[in-house]
Amino acid sequence: IKVGSERWNHYPEIIDELKNKAKAEGLWNLFLPESEFGAGLSNYEYAHLAEEMGKSHIASEAMNCSAPDTGNMEVIARYGNDSHQEEWLKPLLNGDIRSAFSMTEPGTASSDATNMQATAVLDGDEYVINGEKWWTSGAGDPRCKILIFMCVTNPDNPKHQRHSMILGPMETEGVEIKQMMHVFGYDDAPHG
């Protein structure tokens, strides 16, 4: 077990070996109901497998079924264009990279997205994002390469139609991790 700041640059070495075994046994990407990308299981069928995976802290990652990657892959599979799927979904589906999801903000009850303050404004063919997030699931993992950032893009719309999820590489200029948060004394390294 690594200690101190080194905990953020390390993940269990056995994971890669277990991933290869899971792929060989057909125990890979079980969460995606779309058979083109996943195993084609219903949520009910997957629930039984998720319950079993929950008995080990590394099983879901070893089978490429851990959050926030699962939700992020579902979003990109369902709403991403061909370029998004080629650049981000395929490496996620292969288990080559990890992802992060950024919604929670300081000073707001971020489980209610209508409170969100972060914004994204279209500038030409790119979005300029402004805002601070308080907790970004997965951002601490050294393999994290893509971020889904939830923000307000249509401030004049009704409160439940104001938001978008923006894909951004973690290495984008301006993306900065200031500190890893502790919740009930835990920081969930290296995942965060």
Predicted regions: what they are:
Residues 1-67, 74, 78, 83-94, ...:
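Amphipathic, small/basic residue-rich leader segments at the start of a protein or domain
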Residues 60-73, 93-105, 132-147:
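FAD-binding core of FAD-dependent oxidoreductases
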Residues 125-126, 130-176:
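A short core secondary-structure module
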Residues 115, 173-192:
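Flexible, small-/acidic-enriched active-site or ligand-binding loops
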Residues 113-116, 144, 161-163, 189-191:
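Short beta-strand-initiation
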Residues 88, 134, 178-182:
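Short beta-alpha junctions and helix-cap segments that line functional grooves
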Residues 107-111, 137-142, 155-157, 183-190:
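Short Gly/Pro-enriched turn/cap motifs at secondary-structure boundaries
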Residues 118-121:
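A structural signal for short hydrophobic beta-strand segments in well-ordered beta-sheet cores
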